Amino acid sequence: MTRQEVLEIFARYRGESPAITGPSFGGRILYTVDHRPATLYNMELGYPTAMFLGLALCLPSERVFVIEGDGSMLAGLSVLTTIGRYRPCNLVVIVVDNRAYVTTGSVPSATASGADLVAMAKGAGIEKAFRAADLSVFEQCMKRSIAEDGPFFIVADIEKEDMASIGKSKAMPFDIVESCVRFRRTLEDRGLVPPIWSV
């Protein structure tokens, strides 16, 4: 399965829930597939899951989604133990695993040599940690993630990617600063966070 196929299924089940993407072209693909205003795009390596763990704990009535790559997840592994400790039932983490750092020349990541993110998540105390190697399994995981209490940790094994095969994606029409402002304004408009001037 491809990254785009995974994101298309994700978009069908996400609804209007807040979501965050990791760095690089994954966010740009999601923007093209199905842009929603409550999306924080292109967060730095290692930070997406940590940031939305905090959001999940602050907004327990909102299901929140993280989409990041294997490289970004590997850069922020310590967050898994914190998820296992606090177990926010509304947090869904999706790791799109292509086993490489594509934008740096497809340098293999640790998952290419056997590092098992699902086993790490389970070892950290995340019971609902699953691997999806095909679209039907990934879709079943998505269905469960919106119907059951989490936290969920889903690793989607996708086809090998490189810059030649995926092509150069279009640049985002805004930078990370504007993405943050838009994201916060959306949460504010929904009454989920106080107006910025009252903080």
Task: Locate each region found by the language model.
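Glycine-rich beta-alpha junction loops
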Residues: 23-26, 98-100, 157-163
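Glycine/aspartate-rich loop-and-adjacent alpha/beta segment that forms the canonical ThDP
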Residues: 3-4, 35, 148-199
